[in-house]
């Protein structure tokens, strides 16, 4: 009986050892003995990684070679002393919160073997200035780079089909970003509160712009919505105070609540659709400068409903004042009722804001 208990104890000890955390040269791993792979993990007793870390492609444990294929959940989370890290080409996935709040990390190179970047993987890495996402990555997880306030630019590869919810939220240092034509959806709050963002190029592969996708991007001065987009989400462009005008393509059939609310600089909206899209509540809430809605020829009656009819509805394409060339001056200026308001004018100075006709063309002041 005593021998049986001893044998059972040895087997139990072996099983516990097999499941135990392994440390090799200062890095901790979980081993998968069924396929000889290893996952980098955090040390369960609270010790934090620091300095410059080089993760090997494989480790040798008790005579067995283990390939390092993943960086696990919270592996380097809150490692405030971590300054640099080298990830081998054997790694295919970066887990949720893997580098969360590593605020001294300034740069990182993701190898081409990685296909998945987990939720909040690099969130609040506030010193991270640049990062290159390889074209092996197909999706960017929830809040993957949220709060990376020093990040100035990022290139999204054309392997990515979806930009996850809050993926780049609070990246206040971002000034511009190009989205590849492989992307079909821009997730909720994907670029929310990127106050430094001045321009963004959305490809015609995108069909859906999520809730608050560009909310509070106060530096955004222009954006072109492609004719592939069918839905604009709740508060999608809310509080984009730098926007002065926006064109909504014919493809858009629905616009969510407060989509353009508090766009304090917005003066005009151009609609390409002959019938109004379905819209939510308070679409233009607190857009105090919004005066004019431009609609296709013959569409003014269709737009004679709320919220459109709360503004001056003008049919036809309207050129901006910047397109009036010097060769067209001096010219007579007429209001929309055909009354001459300024004879042989050199410009529109001195006239109140509104729409005017110059040489048969409509212009906005």
Predicted regions, residues:
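Consensus positions within tandem repeat domains that build extended binding/scaffold surfaces
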Residues: 73-75, 95-100, 118-123, 141-146, ...
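Terminal processing/anchoring signals of secreted or surface-associated proteins
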Residues: 20, 303, 320-321, 338, ...
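N-terminal signal peptide c-region/cleavage motif recognized by signal peptidases
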Residues: 15-17
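Sec-dependent signal peptide recognition
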Residues: 3-9
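Structural signature of tandem-repeat unit edges
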Residues: 33-36, 49-70, 80-93, 103-116, ...
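Residue-level detector of functionally pivotal "anchor" positions at catalytic/ligand-binding pockets or at interdomain
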Residues: 315-337
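C-terminal tail/sorting-segment detector
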Residues: 1-3, 353-365
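Cleaved targeting-peptide boundary
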Residues: 21-27
